[in-house]
């Protein structure tokens, strides 16, 4: 079935967290210890990073690195915490999407629409996940590599770690270093996994909502039946589907609204990453900062692009009404004509996805991109 591909990548990612998206409620938390370990690994690592920043207040590069790391940790904890807090609500919303898709994908056109949006969603989600995986792997592998290079040059083995942190023990001992390094890796996994899970879930639900709006638009343009009764039934179904799409969009916005506020943090993060990229332009750490910058840009782009697409698809329903075969209804049923007018007025409002202070749309993405470009131009001057 077409719905078998629903949330395929997202379900696999959430299983790594010990959570099930598409099963019954009683098996929702199949392995709760995974989520707990994920939270503890990040929460326990943050004090080490904060201590590193306090210890290097006079060093701008190291202080910036620690602030950036703390910001990422806080965002990851907020995401996994919010998802677990609203877990039942998210599962109910996912179940609603699944039921509507099952009901509405019995025609060839509907299948084509859902398949196209699903492929786009899985491609974007996979690319986003690969960026985080590349950033995490490069960070974890670069520190041992830097240690080996430094040892070949100086003959001394200095412990280095993927992320800024200080420890209450001597890492010159191999056993202590292994424990510290493993702690870094666990923290990296604890940050990347929930971040990718929640962001790709929003991406998938947004694309499926766009598909449902497109199906409603297609049915609106072909609502005419073989007789008056069938025509009325078709219109009734179209309006019900459109109302259901609006309802799904409302709940999607309500549940993800606190996360969309991350644009403020992401914008600050991009400014910090500009400095770090320029400071490490000829260093092995460049791969990590480049991949991580791509991941943060992808994160902002996902929310802005998906939010803009939902809003546009909702508004296009009014155009579908205008292009449909409605003139003959003027002579048959004036009440239906009034319903069409009301639907057109409602569609003009769209279905905005906002984060309290701003909307997640292309204009916001352009604003963030311009700020990123301006900071990129000024960064070389600061370094000089």
Curated annotation (Swiss-Prot):
Job description of the protein: Odorant receptor which mediates acceptance or avoidance behavior, depending on its substrates. The odorant receptor repertoire encodes a large collection of odor stimuli that vary widely in identity, intensity, and duration. May form a complex with Orco to form odorant-sensing units, providing sensitive and prolonged odorant signaling and calcium permeability.
TM ranges: 35-55, 67-87, 129-149, 178-198, 259-279, 285-305, 330-350
A molecular function (GO) term: odorant binding
Gene transcribed to yield this protein: Or98b
Record flagged with keyword Mitochondrion: no
Keyword Cell membrane attached: yes
Subcellular location: Cell membrane
Subunit structure: Interacts with Orco. Complexes exist early in the endomembrane system in olfactory sensory neurons (OSNs), coupling these complexes to the conserved ciliary trafficking pathway.
Topology, Extracellular side: 56-66, 150-177, 280-284, 351-384
Protein name: Putative odorant receptor 98b
Cytoplasmic side of membrane: 1-34, 88-128, 199-258, 306-329
GO cellular component: cation channel complex; dendrite membrane; plasma membrane
Any one Gene Ontology BP term: detection of chemical stimulus involved in sensory perception of smell
Family: Belongs to the insect chemoreceptor superfamily. Heteromeric odorant receptor channel (TC 1.A.69) family. Or1a subfamily.
Pfam families for the chain: 7tm_6
Membrane topology of the entry: Multi-pass membrane protein
Miscellaneous remark of the record: The atypical heteromeric and topological design of the odorant receptors appears to be an insect-specific solution for odor recognition, making the OR/Orco complex an attractive target for the development of highly selective insect repellents to disrupt olfactory-mediated host-seeking behaviors of insect disease vectors. Odor-evoked OR currents are independent of known G-protein-coupled second messenger pathways.
Key words, A-Z: Cell membrane, Membrane, Olfaction, Receptor, Sensory transduction, Transducer, Transmembrane, Transmembrane helix
